[in-house]
Amino acid sequence: VHLSADEKNALATLWGKVNPDELGGEALGRLLVVYPWTQRFFDSFGDLSSATAVMGNPKVKAHGKKVLDSFSDGLKHLDNLKGTFSSLSELHCDKLHVDPENFRLLGNELVLVLALHLGKDFTPQVQAAFQKVVAGVANALAHKYH
């Protein structure tokens, strides 16, 4: 992902304000509610029968935190996203058979959640930088797909 020095600094500053415990679950929960067909990959998560159930589900929150922790790792390795996400790409492709389009959808939900929580600090310029990163991460996660 090609980012200017200003974009990298803005991302680092704003990412320091992010609470992965809270925002990861919210982003994943929104994915599962807005795109209900994505729920089929989460059969073991229990009750996903309503928006309230999804958003309050502790397994959704825990997995969302894992997702954001991985995203945080990606922010530290912007010059090597494919390498950083290689094992996760393999897992999601070969074992879990996740549609790679879901990575793009989740990235969009993450951007929405960041905008909601960061408010005026999430300027159009910051959004543009985050969009580049989530697109890069989605591409890296889809890399092992044939």
Curated annotation (Swiss-Prot):
Single GO BP term: hydrogen peroxide catabolic process
Homology family: Belongs to the globin family.
Domain called Globin: residue spans: 2-146
Function: Involved in oxygen transport from the lung to the various peripheral tissues.
GO molecular function: haptoglobin binding; heme binding; hemoglobin alpha binding; metal ion binding; organic acid binding; oxygen binding; oxygen carrier activity; peroxidase activity
Protein name as catalogued: Hemoglobin subunit beta
Entry keyword Metal-binding: yes
Modified residues (N6-acetyllysine): K59, K82, K144
Quaternary organization: Heterotetramer of two alpha chains and two beta chains.
UniProt xrefs under Gene3D superfamilies: Globins (1.10.490.10)
Superkingdom, natural source: Eukaryota
Residues bearing PTM S-nitrosocysteine: C93
Tissue expression per record: Red blood cells.
Phosphoserine PTM sites in chain numbering: S44
